[in-house]
Regions:
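Membrane-embedded alpha-helical bundles of multi-pass transporters/translocases
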Residues: 2-462
Length: 462
């Protein structure tokens, strides 16, 4: 049972700000990895893009076990005086931050190729498959324990997106300004600076996790679920639970689009356009616009038209923007920045409401099965997100290798044109796949969500 303070303190701004800091903490390591790990290991450590992408993909498949296992551990855990989910933030904030820092060690650039590949493999699995999983799954599951009110959960989703956007702002704007240097007239990544940046962000992540722990309160008692883990049954539930399958497909393709945009930004701006400053500006503008446009209006639009409906339309618009940019092939970097920011606004609408959609899926599962499995469902969803990250890394690395990218050919004209093409085509494919997944698979329309909320309210008050 949660303690009395947690049960009686009303939901308010303290919880929303605290939950925001949780995703701020997550993304100090997640966005750093998705945006700069490939660039760091290809340009600083001298590892092939294809090898880096393959390692990232293999590591994510390890998550098939660690994510589900962590979800079961969370579901089986008994509430303490600090709640059921909050204690994990305090326990695991140090390990996840240290592992992230160890990935970006430029001092090892002179080691053998095999050693560098092994170092990346081990540290990346420690960070993503073990430590990040052990803090992110309890954090995501915690939303349903903070409040039972769908409106409160929608606000938590919005504030989570604000935290993610602020992290994108700090990392996306600050890192290119500090990490890139000019050598022989070319913009290149400084390995030693990246190591320092990774260390600073790791410290910031720990501080933000602790702020989340101290500010948030759990109010909904979530009893321990001691049912044994059945992988076959769980996989069957994915394919028989249309809502879960739909959101998993959408999440996978959303990450493919978003992380390809972020990852390729580290190549298209310095290599194709020769402007790391434009990369900082693009990150700044897209983050600010998400805060000004998406955060205030996403919840209102979702309440009026429905979460599924808003997300589908926004991804269709993003697809059109990426296709137009590919056809026009703007030579002016600021025109490209305009397309980049506009697509990110569309992505931002979906990102702002997607966490509320997860709680809708959890509610739908409880309505149909009579069992609430927050941790397990969130674990399956988290695994889908990591698959999206893996596929984007594998695809990006494979395509960069296909166009002949290496530290030696990074500025060849045919290679830089290939970089531009990848930066438009890959996100466009991801966005259209998200829209199709939501439209044809995901069944939780505005009306269906309202019916589920009413059914659960009646059931819980019996």
């Amino acid at each position: 049972m949660a303690n009395e303070m947690q049960k009686t303190t009303p939901f308010g701004m303290r919880d929303k700000v605290g939950y925001m800091f949780g995703d701020f903490a997550n993304d100090f390591t997640f966005i750093l990895s998705s945006s700069f790990l490939m660039k760091f290991y290809t340009d600083v450590m001298g590892v092939s893009a294809g090898v880096v992408g393959m390692i990232m993909m293999i590591a994510r498949f390890v998550d098939a076990f660690t994510d589900v296992t962590m979800g079961q551990i969370v579901d089986r855990s008994k509430p303490t005086k600090d709640g059921k989910f909050r204690p994990w933030l305090k326990r695991m904030c140090g390990p996840v931050a240290i592992a992230s820092f160890l990935i970006f060690q430029s001092g090892l650039a002179g080691m053998s190729y095999g050693f560098k590949v092994a170092w990346l493999f081990v540290t990346y699995i420690l960070w993503g498959s073990i430590f990040y999983t052990s803090v992110n799954i309890p954090y995501g599951s915690m939303a349903s324990a903070i409040s039972a009110d769908p409106k409160d959960r929608a606000e938590l989703s919005t504030w989570r997106t604000i935290g993610s956007t602020l992290a994108s702002l700090v990392i996306g704007v600050g890192t290119p300004m500090v990490a890139y240097v000019t050598v022989n007239g070319q913009t290149v990544l400084s390995g030693s600076r990246m190591t320092i940046i990774a260390g600073v962000f790791s410290v910031c992540a720990i501080l933000c996790y602790l702020l989340c722990f101290n500010l948030v309160r759990e109010r909904v008692d979530v009893p321990a679920n001691n049912s044994k883990m059945d992988i076959g049954k769980m996989l069957k539930s994915v394919f028989t639970n249309r809502a879960l399958l739909g959101i998993i497909a959408a999440a996978l393709f959303l990450l493919l689009a978003m992380l390809t945009m972020q990852g390729m930004a580290g190549y298209v701006f310095p290599n194709f356009y020769g402007s790391a400053a434009a990369q900082s500006t693009a990150s700044l503008l897209s983050s600010v616009l998400i805060l000004l446009v998406c955060a205030p209006f996403a919840s209102k639009l979702a309440s009026r038209f429905g979460k599924k409906e808003l997300a589908t339309v926004s991804c269709i618009v993003a697809t059109v923007l990426e296709v137009i940019c590919f056809v026009l092939k703007p030579t002016n970097v600021w025109v490209y920045v305009g397309f980049y920011c506009a697509a990110f606004i569309c992505l931002g609408f979906f990102n702002t409401i997607i966490w509320a959609m997860i709680t809708d899926v959890i509610d739908d599962s409880e309505v149909r099965n009579g069992i609430r499995e927050d941790g397990t469902i969130y674990a399956v969803y988290s695994f889908a997100r990591k698959l999206g990250q893996a596929f984007s890394s594998g695809l990006t690395g494979g395509l960069l290798t296909m166009i002949g990218y290496s530290a030696a050919t990074a500025f060849d004209p045919e290679v830089t044109m290939g970089i531009f093409n990848i930066s438009c085509i890959a996100p466009a494919i991801g966005f259209v796949a998200v829209a199709l997944s939501l439209f044809f698979i995901y069944p939780l329309t505005k009306q269906k969500v309202e019916e589920n909320v009413a059914a659960l309210a009646q059931r819980h008050h019996k």
